[in-house]
Amino acid sequence: MFSLISFTRQWASVYKPMQHGRKDARGRVRKRFMCIENIAQLANFAKELQSAESPFVAVETNIGGTLTERFMSPEYNVYFFVMGKGKLQDNDGEDADTKQEAMEHAVKFLMYLRQHKEEVNAKGMGMDGASMIDTDNVRFETFGPFMNRWFCVGISLFGLEKMGCINPDDYVSQEGQEEKE
């Protein structure tokens, strides 16, 4: 089954600017991927943010969305962080460049996800979950600066899942309840 968290972790490990999980020149393992509850709770992952390397990607584990009569449309949020250069006061437009770099990482992630969807569809693998994510209509927003001059671009991906029917095995039958009483 498709998991956006696993997919994003795998992307971060093969994407050259990140190479999550591989050793750097000093022999340290590069941490370029993390899960966060949500972007509003930056304080909860501030310690990890201070030790993270630029660029890195984070997936929000809280999921929102909408339910209609027959469909569920979950919203998934992915954030692409880049450390700004220079001092906050003397940036001379560097903040805009940093945000643009974060946006470039987000676009490359979306292209990779689209390619995965096309491969799944071409192989006739059915609906693996990735095919249910709309990569044509993506909302994005910039955030920052955070501590140590971090900036990020957050993207919101929307899914569409058909809700199934009631499974009678999930419930106690009427006869079963009457026997108890």
Mark where each language-model region is.
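C-terminal tail/extension regions appended to the core domain(s) of diverse proteins
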Residues: 152, 157-181
